[in-house]
Structures are given as structure tokens and as C-alpha cells.
Amino acid sequence: MKDEKVAVVTGAARGIGQAICEQLLEDGFHVVGLDISPVEWSQSPNLSSYQVNLCEAAAVSEVVDSIVAKHQRIDVLVNNAGITRDALLPDMLEQDWDSVIDVNLKAVFLLTQRVAPVMLEQGAGSIVSISSIVGTDGNIGQSNYGASKGGVIAMSKGWAKEFVRKGAQIRVNCVAPGFIATDMTKSLPEKVIQMMESKTPLGRMGSAQDIANGVAFLASDKSAFITGQVLKIDGGLVL
């Protein structure tokens, strides 16, 4: 349907990205999931997907062109895809620095660079990028991850100012998750999980749905007067 709102979500194959897609589907969007892996968790007619390496500019341009050709619009962009390659600074390999910066920061730049003109032509849109409390407050052993997520916040604040210069109602915000239960955290020792839960005032790890709820709010008209902000969803871990 031409009037159906379209949301593009990266890192859509599993975890937080899948939860975001499911929530936006429930909210009535047609969701386009992007991932380097196949998106196979649903056969909904309101979900379409593309396998794409978002670190390659040509591939990003091609997939955005395909989305616009099919749907004629992009109302929401959720930059969610991300990786970690943790190590203390003396032990961090250059390739681990590069790969995290490429996926977590460069890919956000490349995709937003291609989607923003679509939203500018429409005169409206919402861009939500997943940052992290590591991007706002840092963490031992995550120099690369912290730099990438801090960079996402800085870019988003700049874009919040840039994209509205000619009157377009394009909002740009970030969500900064705290300690979230995902496939990535399942391998952590129980002692580590208990330590993080004890440091969190609400006394538990967050869920992928907690993040999806925040993204859905920022994607919706309920947040129509919110832009350039970082929504921390961390159970009070960082106060």
C-alpha cells in the first residue's frame, strides 16, 4: 500500500533487531529488515528483507534504491546492527578496532547518508540509532566499541540540526541500552551477570523488548517533539 508507513531496521536477523522489527510490525509498519545474515524468523507479508553488507557504500546505495523503488518511501530508519571485539588497549588488534568502527559507525553513516535524502524529499521521518551506555560513559576493554557508539551519538546530534534546516520534520535520536539479555550475553559467567544485576537499581538485566519499546516510541508520532536526544534504557545502571 502506498500510504503504509515503512520502517527500515538493520541487524534484523536476531536479538534486539528482531524484537524491534516485531514491535514495529505490531505497530502497523511495513518493516524492511537488513542484515548480513538472512532474516528467517517470520513469513509475514508485512516484512521484507535484504542480505547486505552495510559497510560497503555500493551495496548500501543499491539496497536503498530497491526499497524506494518498491515502497516509494522510508518513514523510519533504525540503525541497530553492531558487533563487539573487546580487549584491553595493549591487547586490542588493529583489525578488531577497524571491524567495530566499520560495522557500528561507518555503516550508520553510509545508510543514513542514503536514506536522509529520501526523508528530506518526503519532508518528514524518524531516525533512531542504537548507541550504548558505553558510548556515553565508557567501559574497560571496549575502546573500539565506546568510540563507535559515542560517534553514533555525535553524528545523530549533528544530523538532528542538519536535516531540519529547510523545514523538514526529520527527527534523529539515539537509544543507549544498558546490560541487555541477548544471545551475546548467554555465554557470560553467572558471576558476571549477578554482578551487573546487583549494580542495576532495578535489579535485573534488560530485555530486547525493553529496547524495542523505546525505539517504537521514538519512531512514533508520540515523540513528535523529541529530537537530538539519547534515551538511556539501562534500569538506572548509569545515573
Which positions does each model-derived feature cover?
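Residue(s) in the substrate-gating loop at a strand-loop-helix junction
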Residues: S132
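Alpha-helical segment proximal to the catalytic Tyr-Lys
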Residues: P117, K157, K161-R165, A224
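The beta1-alpha1 cofactor-binding region of Rossmann-like NAD(H)/NADP(H)-dependent oxidoreductases
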Residues: V52-E62, E94, Q209-D210
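Short, small/polar-rich loop/turn modules that mediate ligand/substrate recognition or access, typified
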Residues: V164-R171, I226-G228
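Active-site helix of classical SDR
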Residues: T112, S148, S156
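C-terminal substrate-recognition "lid" of short-chain dehydrogenase/reductases
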Residues: F109-T112, L120, R204-I233, V238
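Substrate-binding pocket helix/loop in short-chain dehydrogenase/reductase
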Residues: L88-L89, D96-I101, I127, T185, ...
